[in-house]
């Protein structure tokens, strides 16, 4: 079961595309948007990650990261190739994905396409899951959640 609004987001540490450790609790005091996507180099994932780079989300204190099971090397090449501006986090064994309850039940080696907005105090302010991995996420509720947080 996916994490719910009002829950404290589980803290985690994952490696970025540059092999740097990225820890959720290091960003307390900022709103954090966690964008789970199934795989680097796939059309919908590319479109979403490029869109968020071209059209940043509202809120000056908002940190955006993408999360997938792909390796740091894949993330690095994909980010450079596509001009993606935000960090991409590698969750190759889906450990963090499972903590948030976002593993895909029909395809156990990938995550759902999902968005979790964590507020400045570390609480989940929004959680949205796309049931079809081929469908782009709905950005409206994400913008709305961030607008309420300020």
Residue ranges of predicted features:
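Chalcogenol-based redox active-site neighborhoods
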Residues: 1-150
């Amino acid at each position: 079961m996916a994490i719910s609004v009002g829950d404290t987001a589980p803290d985690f540490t994952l490696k970025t595309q540059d092999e740097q450790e990225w820890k959720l609790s290091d960003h307390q005091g900022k709103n954090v948007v966690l964008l789970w996507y199934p795989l680097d180099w796939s059309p919908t994932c590319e479109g979403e990650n490029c869109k968020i780079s071209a059209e940043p989300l509202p809120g000056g204190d908002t940190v955006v990261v993408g999360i997938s099971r792909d390796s740091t090397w894949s993330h690095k090449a994909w980010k450079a190739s596509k001009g993606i501006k935000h960090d991409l986090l590698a969750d190759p064994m889906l450990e963090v994905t499972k903590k948030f309850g976002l593993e895909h039940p029909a395809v156990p080696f990938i995550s759902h396409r999902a968005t979790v907005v964590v507020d400045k105090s570390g609480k989940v302010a929004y959680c949205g899951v796309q049931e079809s991995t081929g469908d782009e996420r709905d950005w409206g509720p994400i913008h709305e959640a961030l607008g309420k947080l300020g």
